[in-house]
A protein has these predicted regions:
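C-terminal structural segment of proteins
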Residues: 1-265
Length: 265
């Protein structure tokens, strides 16, 4: 790891100003992705701007039809928050199965979304729930936020402040995970709204994506049988040491069916 400077920001404007003044600086939240990259000398930021003590980034609010989570809230706090568990249990359940205890105690929702790892869990929730990512300067719909592998719509000096999740009628998340890392080989988040069903998949491609065929089938008939009857193409899916594209394509309707069963209680 190369040497770097560290400073703790006290508000979003100060954090953004520090990054704007140094193009080689990086925001630091839980550090669960950034610090390992730095240890391998794959990243060499000149400064780390710690945003974990900014009060505006640490709050959780549950209002009528919406759950708002500050960007610096760790996974464990999302999982354990009583109001989140009541209003949006699928999100709490997702957070409670990210990584191990250390990762859940340090990793943050904002850091996960900004990093946009292809196998991360939170992007599937953001996409399926039609979340809005609130930054220090604008509001970004989830459909516009995730651009590609480790890429988002964020500007280099733009800071996520909070994430707003609409509350669906029913929802569930199911993943087939790597037993060592707990990353998803395939993860499926299903959300049923009055307007229809949204299905988002992580771990299977270069970035999170929705599956229109499953959404149409489940909007017409919200049953596991309807999900299992859908065939998903493997043409744009990943093949790696963990699973082939064909196997991932097979898993998507299987896990979707399990998520529907889970959502139906």
């Amino acid at each position: 790891m190369y040497s770097f400077e560290y400073q703790r920001a006290t508000d979003p404007k100060a954090a953004a100003a520090a990054i704007a003044a140094d193009s080689n600086a990086k925001f630091l939240a839980g550090g669960q992705s950034l610090l390992p990259t730095m240890r391998l000398r794959l990243a060499q930021p000149s400064q780390l701007i710690d945003v974990t003590r900014i009060p505006a980034l640490k709050s959780i609010a549950v209002d009528a039809g919406k759950v708002t989570i500050g960007a610096a809230v760790c996974h464990a706090d999302v999982a354990d928050h009583a109001e989140v568990r009541r209003a949006l249990p699928a999100l709490a359940d997702l957070a409670g199965h990210i990584g191990d205890r250390q990762v859940r105690a340090l990793g943050t929702i904002g850091g996960s979304l900004a990093n946009n790892d292809p196998a991360a869990c939170y992007p599937s929730a953001a996409m399926a729930l039609d979340a809005t990512i609130v930054t220090d300067r604008r509001r970004i719909s989830s459909k516009d936020f995730f651009v590609g592998m480790y890429e988002t719509a964020l500007a280099p000096d733009e800071l996520i402040v909070a994430v707003e999740f609409p509350v669906p009628e029913r929802a569930a998340y199911v993943k087939f995970e790597n037993p060592a890392s707990h990353f998803a080989l395939v993860g499926v988040f299903v959300a049923k709204f009055a307007s229809g069903v949204r299905v988002a998949v992580t771990g299977a491609a270069s970035s999170v994506f929705r599956v229109p065929e499953l959404e149409s089938a489940l909007s017409a008939n919200f049953t596991p049988e309807a999900a299992r009857a859908v065939t998903v193409s493997d043409s744009d899916l990943n093949t790696d040491m963990h699973a082939s594209a064909e196997y991932r394509a097979h898993l998507i309707p299987v896990l979707t069916a399990r998520a529907v069963t889970k959502a139906n209680g």
